[in-house]
Structures are given as C-alpha cells and as structure tokens.
Amino acid sequence: MILIDGKSLSKDLKERLATQVQEYKHHTAITPKLVAIIVGNDPASKTYVASKEKACAQVGIDSQVITLPEHTTESELLELIDQLNNDSSVHAILVQLPLPAHINKNNVIYSIKPEKDVDGFHPTNVGRLQLRDKKCLESCTPKGIMTMLREYGIKTEGAYAVVVGASNVVGKPVSQLLLNAKATVTTCHRFTTDLKSHTTKADILIVAVGKPNFITADMVKEGAVVIDVGINHVDGKIVGDVDFAAVKDKVAAITPVPGGVGPMTITELLYNTFQCAQELNR
C-alpha cells in the first residue's frame, strides 16, 4: 500500500513554486499578491487564513488580510471587492467562507473578477473548466487531488472513478477534472441508491461527504486508489470520511487524514495566485 503523503508533496511543490516566483519577480519586477477577506470573528476562518498567509510568505508571494466586522453589509463588502478588482497590484482575491447569514454568498463570489478568482468559484471559471480552457482557475481542493494522482503516477486515462459527494466546492469540479483527464466518472450523492454497488467498482474512489468513517472496507475494491477529502472531529481527533485503519490494507494507495488532501489545497491556492499574476500581466 502506498501512502499518498500530501504534506510531503506539498512541501516539494512549494519549493518548486518558490523558485518560479523568484525568477518571475526577477524578470518582471512584479510580486504576486493575494488579498484575503474575513467577515466576522469565526476562529476557524482566522486559522485557515493565517495558514494561507504563512504559505504565501514561504514562496515569496505577498499577502494581505482584511478583517471586517460581523455587521458589515453586503454592499460594503461588494464595494471593497470592486476596489480590489480595480487595483492592479492585487492579483488574487479570496473571501473566506462561511459568511454571516445576512450576506448572500453567491453575490459575493460573482462579484470577484474571474481573473482574480483564486478559489475558482466564479461561474466563468466553472464554465472554463467544462470547456477545458487553459485560462481556467481550478478550484483548489479538486486541483490538489489531481496533482496528487499525477505526481504519484496514478493513471486516470481509462480508469473508472467514483466521486462520493456532489458539492460545488469538491464533488462536481473534481468529477469534471477526472472526465477531462479521460477517466470514466460516476458522481454519487445523498439520493444515490445502493452506493456500495458503485464504490466497489471504482479504480479511483474520491470521498467528500463530511461523515466520519463513512466508507468501510466492504465498500472498496481490492487494489483501488482512495482519496479521502473529509475532515471530521471525533473525540478530539481529526478523522476522514474513510475508515482508514480498515481500508488501508485492501487498497493500492490511500491518503491519510490529516496530512493528505488538506496541505495540497493551500499549495494549489499559491499556484493559482501565481497563475493570476502571470495572466493579468501578460
């Protein structure tokens, strides 16, 4: 069994990116810049953004965090985003979710200039993903999953891939990326009947449902590759959506939780920020 070590791979990829960013800055005198916006005082959001700030510094990308009070209105937030859209020194914009209930998430996502939409959530980038447009900014977690498969030499062409979970953030975009990579793809969701009949056929099984130890050994094919996107807190520990202990001896490769997909998400955010800077300054 191969352990797909996202933490180690992420470190290698950041070292590669740091070299690219340094060369880019030397040749263009432009420093890629990411601006992250937090609305309110959610501790998890602050932790996530702090880790993104730290990662930016590691590769030579500038970052700025703007923290707005909980009572910030939607129009005030949209006005700030408009200013950042028109600021040529800002290449990538991230609005940390969740937002307070009085702010419409979609209105905020749609207001970000597609070329600065570092999370890849804007409808333009969703459409570009479908069309395999090279200018597409791919959603960070799905992009990280595909990078893991590629870097570990896991063949997608002709493979049967099953994605459990159909969210706009992970399930749908990773299904499309797998399809673009010439896999045959089935996307399962809460209305899927007889889930096990699908998962036991999967050469590549990707799970993103937010339910601890949801996928058990009897639901996985011998020799499959399993990517666990879940992050769940159980008895003070972080566990995935896959019963790792039961499944690991049955599969060819599997990601751990923590230390699997999570680190790759932040690394791909850095790569997307660099892509934004390059595209905006062509």
From Swiss-Prot:
Keyword list, A-Z: Amino-acid biosynthesis, Histidine biosynthesis, Hydrolase, Methionine biosynthesis, Multifunctional enzyme, NADP, One-carbon metabolism, Oxidoreductase, Purine biosynthesis
InterPro entries linked: Aminoacid_DH-like_N_sf (IPR046346), NAD(P)-bd_dom_sf (IPR036291), THF_DH/CycHdrlase (IPR000672), THF_DH/CycHdrlase_cat_dom (IPR020630), THF_DH/CycHdrlase_CS (IPR020867), THF_DH/CycHdrlase_NAD-bd_dom (IPR020631)
Record-level Gene Ontology MF annotations: methenyltetrahydrofolate cyclohydrolase activity; methylenetetrahydrofolate dehydrogenase (NADP+) activity
E.C. number(s) listed in UniProt: 1.5.1.5, 3.5.4.9
One GO biological process term: L-histidine biosynthetic process
Tree of life domain: Bacteria
GO CC annotation: cytosol
UniProt binding sites for NADP(+): 165-167, 231
Subunit-structure text: Homodimer.
Function per UniProt: Catalyzes the oxidation of 5,10-methylenetetrahydrofolate to 5,10-methenyltetrahydrofolate and then the hydrolysis of 5,10-methenyltetrahydrofolate to 10-formyltetrahydrofolate.
Family from the record: Belongs to the tetrahydrofolate dehydrogenase/cyclohydrolase family.
PANTHER family documented for this protein: C-1-TETRAHYDROFOLATE SYNTHASE, CYTOPLASMIC, C-1-TETRAHYDROFOLATE SYNTHASE, CYTOPLASMIC-RELATED
Name listed for the protein in its UniProt record: Bifunctional protein FolD
Organism: Francisella tularensis subsp. tularensis (strain SCHU S4 / Schu 4)
Gene assigned in the entry: folD
